[in-house]
């Protein structure tokens, strides 16, 4: 525990482990051989706190978040010839096994829905645009859960955005895949 801290020791321990776990990420899918000075990997971290059972339970939830962070980092680390709208949609479809409802719209469906602005972004691409809608209704509904208002997150998953290329500087253009 840190004297004067406004966070419980168990939460502090779990957050320390979570930070170390996030820091351990490494995208080396395309690495052909390890460099001479191989990046050190954290093999173990022991955090002592007075309520270790609570810290372990909190960290278990954080580990699931880290899995999602690593999945996202893997996606944005892929080059544009590997991750494009159809492959991103396929990756999203794989989340069905976790209870996520996934709907993928193609260009025809988007046109019928009047999504001209979105279609305009992708019209210069050789690949078809996709709209991926993911819905997760959570754990089985309790009375308390049913009384809560739904929460919606809206984001974009543009796999490579060179939009406005005439006004963007060329330096860093390769990083436009991080626009997700």
Predicted regions and their residues:
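Short amphipathic alpha-helical segment within the helicase RecA-like ATPase core
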Residues: 1-157, 162, 170, 175
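Gly/Ser-rich catalytic serine loop of serine hydrolases
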Residues: 177-180
């Amino acid at each position: 525990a840190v004297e004067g801290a406004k966070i419980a020791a168990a939460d502090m321990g779990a957050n320390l482990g979570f930070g170390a776990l996030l820091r351990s990420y490494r995208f080396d899918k395309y690495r052909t051989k390890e460099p001479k000075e191989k990046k050190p990997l954290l093999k173990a971290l022991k955090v002592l706190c007075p309520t270790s059972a609570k810290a372990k339970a909190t960290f278990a939830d954080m580990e699931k978040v880290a899995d999602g962070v690593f999945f996202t980092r893997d996606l944005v680390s892929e080059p544009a010839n590997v991750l494009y709208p159809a492959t991103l949609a396929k990756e999203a479809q794989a989340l069905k096994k976790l209870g996520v409802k996934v709907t993928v719209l193609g260009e025809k469906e988007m046109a019928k829905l009047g999504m001209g602005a979105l279609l305009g972004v992708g019209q210069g691409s050789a690949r078809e645009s996709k709209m991926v809608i993911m819905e997760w209704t959570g754990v089985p509904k309790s009375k308390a859960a049913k009384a809560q208002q739904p929460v919606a997150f809206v984001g974009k998953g543009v796999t490579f955005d060179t939009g406005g290329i005439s006004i963007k500087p060329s330096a860093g253009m390769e990083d436009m895949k991080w626009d997700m």
